[in-house]
């Protein structure tokens, strides 16, 4: 059994093609993990807190661009299980399944750049639960351990995304449906971990999600302390 704590920096982007919008976020994350490995089986779980800020831009009907800046606070809880088949040279490959719960609190935001069409958007909270099935290739021996994974992710809940906003200079507000995450989408990731000492590991990883209406990419790096 291995228990560890970690801290690092994250940078992510999201594009929403149907409405010509994009999100760019960066910040600090920290959390803890627990892992159990035996006879090729891997069981694990993690809890992550994310303190980030984001910038959103959207293109209006007349070609002008509205931008806004706001705060993001997130919590992610993940449980996963997998099995690795040894293929030689310290590498193993095998399936991995998991359940991930994500809760995000978005701060309020005031747009600029669109004149009378600028929006002031109220803060909100939303959550998702996902099922994930991946095929993972990883180095299981040595101090330097790269890995690759690819698979599918399925959203299993129906938390409706809504946004409440008002136009500049208008006191009345309105609520509209927001952009919902795709129910099913592809997921690919890669990373590397380097064991600098028995209790300290440096890691870096990247992840991409590919859906029918929105795509997302993220890169993070940090330190993991093993107890």
Which functions belong to the PLM regions below?
Residues 13-24, 52-71, 103-127, 156-184:
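Solvent-exposed, glycine/polar-rich loop segments of beta-barrel outer-membrane systems
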Residues 37-39, 88, 115, 138-142:
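Short strand-coil-strand connectors
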């Amino acid at each position: 059994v291995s228990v560890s704590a970690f801290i690092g920096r994250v940078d992510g982007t999201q594009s929403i093609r149907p409405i010509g919008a994009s999100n760019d976020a960066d910040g600090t994350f920290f959390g803890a993990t627990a892992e159990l490995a035996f006879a090729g089986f891997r069981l694990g779980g993690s809890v992550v807190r994310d303190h980030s800020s984001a910038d959103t831009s959207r293109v209006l009907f007349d070609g002008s661009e509205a931008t806004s800046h706001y705060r993001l606070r997130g919590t992610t809880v993940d449980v996963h299980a997998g099995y690795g088949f040894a293929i030689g040279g310290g590498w193993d490959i095998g399936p991995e399944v998991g359940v991930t719960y994500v809760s995000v609190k978005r701060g309020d935001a005031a747009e600029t750049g669109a004149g009378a069409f600028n929006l002031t958007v109220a803060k909100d909270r939303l959550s998702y639960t996902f099922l994930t099935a991946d095929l993972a290739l990883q180095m299981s021996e040595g101090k330097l351990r790269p890995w690759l994974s690819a698979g599918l992710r399925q959203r299993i809940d129906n938390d409706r995304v809504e946004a409440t906003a008002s136009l500049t200079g208008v006191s009345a507000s309105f609520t509209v449906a927001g952009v919902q995450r795709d129910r099913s989408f592809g997921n690919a990731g890669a990373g590397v971990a380097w064991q600098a000492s028995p209790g300290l590991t440096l890691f870096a990883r990247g992840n991409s999600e590919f859906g029918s209406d929105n795509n997302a990419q993220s890169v993070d790096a940090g330190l993991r302390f093993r107890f």
